Amino acid sequence: MKKLLAIALTVLATVFAFGTPAFAADAAAGAQVFAANCAACHAGGNNAVMPTKTLKADALKTYLAGYKDGSKSLEEAVAYQVTNGQGAMPAFGGRLSDADIANVAAYIADQAENNKW
């Protein structure tokens, strides 16, 4: 009986340690958020207001706070930018849910890191 309990506890501990996180960003859902909220200025990864500040990987590395200095992952830096805005870009925190922001950040990171723009 003790052996069975030990095995069960080991299995449960493994599931909790390596299981799926409570919330994983969804790039496919982020594509929908992007189309509805971002594409007016950022269609195709471009920037209609500041043409040099595109969503392409090389551009993001030069201007995106937190990402350019390595203190944040690309997704974290994009989520921060979307939430708080900067310059001509409005803040979407409060207008989009945290899940929508995480999803759109995952979408933008996927597009940039895989040269899909």
Curated annotation (Swiss-Prot):
This protein's record includes keyword tRNA-binding: no
Post-translational modification: Binds 1 heme c group covalently per subunit.
Biological process according to GO: photosynthesis
Subcellular location: Cellular thylakoid lumen
Source organism, top-level taxon: Bacteria
Entry-linked PROSITE patterns: CYTC
Residues where heme c binds: 38, 41-42, 89
GO cellular component: plasma membrane-derived thylakoid lumen
The keyword Transmembrane is annotated on this UniProt entry: no
SUPFAM superfamilies tied to this protein: Cytochrome c (SSF46626)
Protein keywords: Electron transport, Heme, Iron, Metal-binding, Photosynthesis, Signal, Thylakoid, Transport
Entry's Gene Ontology molecular function annotations: electron transfer activity; heme binding; iron ion binding
InterPro entries from the UniProt entry: Cyt_c-like_dom, Cyt_c-like_dom_sf, Cyt_C6, Cyt_C_IC
Signal peptide: 1-24
Main location: other
SUBUNIT field: Monomer.
Chain's role: Functions as an electron carrier between membrane-bound cytochrome b6-f and photosystem I in oxygenic photosynthesis.
Family designation: Belongs to the cytochrome c family. PetJ subfamily.
Name of protein: Cytochrome c6
Lineage, uppermost ranks: Bacteria, Bacillati, Cyanobacteriota, Cyanophyceae, Oscillatoriophycideae
Gene encoding the protein: petJ
